[in-house]
From Swiss-Prot:
Monomer. Homodimer; disulfide-linked. Occurs in both reduced and oxidized monomeric form. Oxidative conditions increase homodimerization. Interacts with CANX. Interacts with ATP2A2. It comes from Macaca fascicularis (Crab-eating macaque). PANTHER family: THIOREDOXIN-RELATED (PTHR15853), THIOREDOXIN-RELATED TRANSMEMBRANE PROTEIN 2 (PTHR15853:SF0). The thioredoxin domain lacks the 2 redox-active cysteines, suggesting that it lacks thioredoxin activity. The di-lysine motif confers endoplasmic reticulum localization for type I membrane proteins. It is found in: Endoplasmic reticulum membrane; Mitochondrion membrane. This is Thioredoxin-related transmembrane protein 2. A motif (Di-lysine motif) lies at residues 293-296. One of its GO terms (cellular component) is endoplasmic reticulum membrane. Residues 49-102 are extracellular. GO terms for biological process: brain development. Residues 126-296 are cytoplasmic. One of its GO terms (molecular function) is disulfide oxidoreductase activity.
Length: 296
């Protein structure tokens, strides 16, 4: 399954891959990930490179390089077991490939290793992964509008994502959250986002840490009646996030989106004449990642 999951996701996303290759971030990242392969296998780049092969062929891998590449493959397969989107699969491949490339280049020549590390640093400083720009029904808040919107109509249920553009998990979750907003957004159930990397006082007010060590980004909070009802991931006593997978199925089940959606549709049909009701918190049920999504 560790091998089949990324392959199936890759096949279903072939049209998207063609658009990725046209973007500088993915193109340059792919070149950096395959740098050692190109240098070692393509003449005349491989001519004159040191090698430990018995036949002295500088344009082929020696046994130690093969071991490193096999270890890289095993690490990528283990990490991709928990990946949900194609972006996460590709990101893991790029990240661990660059680490393996750095090790392999340092084995050849320390100068080549330093050059490769320098190129990676320049790449990280100049190229940022493209943000999700697809369709969505999401309202973006700032440090002032979030409280006003939550208090404006307490009959409306809000699901708000606290995110930061620099967090890879937030970028991977963006298309999933957008798809959920397209399916479930209605008059009584709204979706919102706030950039806590930009509005730090919001992160303090809603107790969402932006430190990479706490792994609290992204955080989803359900508001009913203007008050927080539940959040994912949960936080332990040390202030760290309890491990939770941000898949579409998990969000639907943990937040009871099907039930909230049906209740919100009744609210929209009844109009504005009904009195405000006390919010009812959904009953969170933790389920495995492999279960299928309920039919709405």
């Amino acid at each position: 399954m560790a091998v089949l999951a990324p392959l199936i996701a890759l096949v279903y996303s072939v049209p998207r891959l063609s658009r990725w290759l046209a973007q500088p971030y993915y193109l340059l990242s792919a070149l950096l990930s395959a740098a050692f392969l190109l240098v070692r296998k393509l003449p005349p780049l491989c001519h004159g490179l040191p090698t430990q092969r018995e036949d002295g062929n500088p344009c082929d891998f020696d046994w130690r390089e093969v071991e490193i590449l096999m270890f890289l493959s095993a690490i990528v397969m283990m990490k991709n077991r928990r990946s949900i989107t194609v972006e996460q699969h590709i990101g893991n491949i790029f990240m661990f490939s660059k680490v393996a490339n750095a090790i392999l280049f340092f084995r050849l020549d320390i100068r080549m290793g330093l050059l490769y590390i320098t190129l990676c640093i320049v790449f990280l400083m100049t190229c940022k992964p493209p943000l999700y720009m697809g369709p969505e029904y999401i309202k973006y808040f700032n440090d002032k509008t979030i409280d006003e919107e939550l208090e404006r109509d307490k009959r409306v249920t809000w699901i708000v994502e606290f995110f930061a553009n620099w967090a890879n998990d937030c970028q991977s979750f963006a298309p999933i959250y957008a798809d959920l907003s397209l399916k479930y957004n209605c008059t009584g159930l709204n979706f919102g986002k706030v950039d806590v990397g930009r509005y730090t006082d919001v992160s303090t007010r809603y107790k969402v840490s932006t430190s990479p060590l706490t792994k609290q980004l992204p955080t989803l909070i359900l508001f009913q009646g203007g008050k927080e009802v539940m959040r994912r991931p949960q936080i332990d006593k040390k202030g760290r996030a309890v491990s939770w997978t941000f898949s579409e199925e998990n969000v639907i089940r943990e937040f009871n989106l099907n039930e909230l959606y049906q209740r919100a549709k009744k609210l929209s049909k009844a109009g504005d004449n009904i009195p405000e009701e006390q919010p009812v918190a959904p009953t969170p049920t933790r389920v495995s990642d492999g279960e299928s999504k309920k039919d709405k």
